[in-house]
A protein has these predicted regions:
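Active-site cofactor/cluster-binding pocket
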Residues: 27-35, 66, 92-103, 134
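Short loop/helix-cap segments at secondary-structure boundaries that form the rim of catalytic
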Residues: 46-53, 105-108
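ATP-dependent small-molecule kinase phosphotransfer cores
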Residues: 1-50, 75
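Conserved phosphate-donor/acceptor-positioning beta-strand/loop module used by diverse small-molecule
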Residues: 52-87
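Small-molecule kinase domains that catalyze NTP-dependent phosphoryl transfer to phosphate-bearing small molecules
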Residues: 77-127
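Short, well-ordered beta-strand core segments
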Residues: 39, 55-57, 113-114
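Short glycine-rich anion-binding loops that position phosphate/pyrophosphate groups of nucleotides
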Residues: 44-47, 61, 119
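C-terminal alpha-helix
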Residues: 127-138
Length: 138
């Protein structure tokens, strides 16, 4: 089970829903790190709020995401599927309300979108590096 799915993680998400300044402060700090350069960042908001960087969206079907989460967390497919559906809905609503972002559907800010369903982590990394080399970023 990942931290986000624990009681503490869920409580943290609830705080974010009612206190947008919490996320905005995290974003300010994240942008400072991005501006320093030479970093790899995983962020839901950075592709929309940062003008710099090579931005990648990792896409996956609900079925494959469910399988991967069930294997990683050793819980049932049904429980994983329900958690993913709730998390996706809550993320969409949160980022729409706080940022006007259509999270999960608007992929315009991304330099690359990869469907990871039939790829290993190594294949995903290799595809990203290849694209970065093609574009002259690497």
């Amino acid at each position: 089970e990942t931290w986000w799915d624990t009681d503490e993680g869920i409580s943290f998400l609830r705080e974010r829903e009612v206190n947008p300044e919490f996320d905005k402060e995290a974003d300010r700090r994240l942008l400072q790190k991005i501006k320093q350069g030479n970093v790899i960042v995983t962020s839901y908001t950075a592709p929309w709020i940062s003008k710099v960087g090579f931005k990648v969206w990792l896409d996956g079907s609900l079925e494959k995401r469910t399988e991967r989460m069930a294997k990683r967390d050793n819980i049932s497919l049904e429980e994983c599927r329900a958690k993913i559906i709730v998390r996706d809905k809550e993320n969409y609503e949160l980022y729409k309300r706080h940022y006007g972002i259509e999270f999960g559907t608007d992929k315009k800010p991304f330099d690359m979108v990869i469907n990871t369903d039939n790829l290993t982590a190594r294949q995903v990394a290799d595809a990203i590096l290849e694209k970065m080399k093609e574009t002259g970023i690497w």
